Each structure stands twice: as C-alpha cells, then as structure tokens.
Amino acid sequence: MNVQEKIRNQVTADTVVLYMKGTPQAPQCGFSGATVQLLKACGVPDFTAVNVLADPEIREGIKAYSNWPTVPQLYIKGEFVGGADIVREMYQQGELQKLRSSAVG
C-alpha cells in the first residue's frame, strides 16, 4: 500500500480525523493545539488524531493528498475541511458546529 492509499484509508476510517503535529494531549505546535481546542469547544469528544511527526511519509503525503501545504489538516466524513485558519474561521462563523452536528449527530 502506498502512502496515498494509507491516507485515504485513514481519512475514511473515522468520522473526524485530524492530521497534526503531536497528539491531542501534547500538541507540538500552536496551530495543532488550537485546532484540538476548537474541536473540543464544538463538542467533538473523540476523534482520530494522526501525529505527522511520527511518520515522515505521512507528513509529506498528506500535503500532496489534500493539495494543502501545511498541517494541521481536518477531515470530516472523508472530506478535507481545512487547516488551522480555516477551522478557526468556520468556528467563529458557526459553520464548524453545523458540520460537527451533521457528522456526529
């Protein structure tokens, strides 16, 4: 299985998947930590977190998969939602909460 297939399997295996630097309990960058906090603020109690620092192939592969140059990257129901700035904007506009409701509820 190549890295793109592995990523496709990861983003479709769970409803909410976050590619981040570090873990939700110990984020390794401010943007990843902020995205985790926004998910928690939206009432997403459980999500799959993929630590890109643990796997260099995933770290580079996720950028090609989404055609997005940075991490973190949020996926809901297999669809790329965005990075930290987009997730924050969506939260501020109430869009992230709506997306969460349709994904979880």
Language-model segment annotations:
Residues 19, 73-77:
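Acidic beta-strand-to-loop metal/phosphate-binding motif
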Residues 1-8:
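Flexible, polar/low-complexity N-terminal or interdomain linker segments that lie immediately upstream
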Residues 8-9, 88:
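Short secondary-structure boundary/capping segments
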Residues 44-59, 69:
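Thiol-based oxidoreductase modules, predominantly thioredoxin-like and allied folds used
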Residues 64-70:
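Thiol/disulfide oxidoreductase modules built on the thioredoxin-like
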Residues 76-105:
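Non-catalytic, surface beta->alpha helical segment in thiol-disulfide oxidoreductase systems
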Residues 5, 59-61:
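TIR-domain catalytic/interaction hotspot
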Residues 9-46:
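Local sequence-structure signature of Cys/Sec-based thiol-disulfide redox active-site neighborhoods
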